[in-house]
């Protein structure tokens, strides 16, 4: 499976940023409020990132024990289906993080360019933006953890 391209992530950020800015502009022009993310979105996004990192720990331990030869006995292998599920979850988390980053960045640009900046409306969106960045970073890190080590027998 190919790793996620940074170009794909950038496209998701750009597209969702345009949508976030466009919807915010549409809402304000029609007398509605600027969309504000609840604090629960930031908390649940951060929790998903922590859980994903926790799911990758057994894979990281197994990979480390193989590459560094910390034990004399062969380590217990990780279920390959488990590893694939964690890998797919990390890819989904990275793309979701990119979409949330773009959305919140677009909304924040609209909020900061408004004639009156309401601090109560920007704080939850900034918090959600930080949580989305965390989710994106964890998605990339876990994807690297799930990468197979190079086979040394092919090199010889």
What is each residue range found by the language model?
Residues 39-61, 136:
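Hydrophobic alpha-helical membrane-embedded segments
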Residues 56-83:
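Membrane-helix interface/capping segments
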Residues 83-97:
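Loop-to-transmembrane boundary segments
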Residues 2-3, 114-155:
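Alpha-helical transmembrane segments and their immediate juxtamembrane interface regions
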Residues 16-20, 48-52, 131, 135, ...:
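Alpha-helical transmembrane segments of multipass membrane proteins
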Residues 1-49, 105, 112, 119, ...:
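Long, highly hydrophobic alpha-helical transmembrane signal-anchor segments
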Residues 94-114:
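Alpha-helical transmembrane segments and their membrane-interface junctions
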Residues 27-31, 63-67, 109-116, 146-154:
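Membrane-interfacial segments
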């Amino acid at each position: 499976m190919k790793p996620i391209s940074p170009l794909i992530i950038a496209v998701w950020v750009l597209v969702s940023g345009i949508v976030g800015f466009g919807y915010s502009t549409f809402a304000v022009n029609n007398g509605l409020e600027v969309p504000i993310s609840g604090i629960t979105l930031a908390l649940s996004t951060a929790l998903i990132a922590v859980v994903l990192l926790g799911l990758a720990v057994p894979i990281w331990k197994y990979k480390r024990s193989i590459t560094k030869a910390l034990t004399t006995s062969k380590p217990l292998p990780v279920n390959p289906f488990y590893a694939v599920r964690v890998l797919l979850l990390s890819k989904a988390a990275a793309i979701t993080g990119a979409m949330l980053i773009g959305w919140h960045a677009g909304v924040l640009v609209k909020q900061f360019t408004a004639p009156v900046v309401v601090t109560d409306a920007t704080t939850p969106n900034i918090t959600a933006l930080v949580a989305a960045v965390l989710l994106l970073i964890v998605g990339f890190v876990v994807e690297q953890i799930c990468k197979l080590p190079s086979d040394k027998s092919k090199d010889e």
